[in-house]
Curated annotation (Swiss-Prot):
Protein name: 16S rRNA (adenine(1408)-N(1))-methyltransferase
Keyword Cell cycle applies: no
Effect in UniProt of substituting residue 55 to A: Decrease in kanamycin resistance. Decrease in methyltransferase activity
Native organism taxonomy: Bacteria, Pseudomonadati, Pseudomonadota, Gammaproteobacteria, Enterobacterales
BP-aspect Gene Ontology terms: methylation; response to antibiotic
Amino acid sequence: MLILKGTKTVDLSKDELTEIIGQFDRVHIDLGTGDGRNIYKLAINDQNTFYIGIDPVKENLFDISKKIIKKPSKGGLSNVVFVIAAAESLPFELKNIADSISILFPWGTLLEYVIKPNRDILSNVADLAKKEAHFEFVTTYSDSYEEAEIKKRGLPLLSKAYFLSEQYKAELSNSGFRIDDVKELDNEYVKQFNSLWAKRLAFGRKRSFFRVSGHVSKH
């Protein structure tokens, strides 16, 4: 699979990945990791977990990718890697390794896959996880601010009731995700996240955010 080192993509084999993650207690995968700033912050504060950020747009990751290969005294980290891949083509090397998975503030097609559960895509995401791994999806959009995107993708209006509906829970379950909890949250909650996109949302106009969490039940 292709990973980013600085501004260059290099190949990382399954054996090489296995050797690396064997040095850590846990593995966390963040799909649609954006600029990588959020998992970089998490990796700094949790040296026992190996963080894998996945995103198809490598250019957005250059700043953080250049930082993690520096000396530790200059911000370098050994417990984070960025994989260049889209949700539609996840590397087989990542199968069955994650203790937890997150999809935070997705947009575009990834948002659509989560809100209108795409069984093929989400089943492949579930395949990245170990049995009973934890998952967290945090989403937001508003008919007051993103009406065009909602119409373009045929998205439903977001509500806690939508995520708790039997239809949504069943569709997510068919993809391998068992919902344990749904929370409606506000801008203040999002201020803890470090990506530029999250900061833009957190400090922008007032809106609701929905956190769906649970466990992977596919295996």
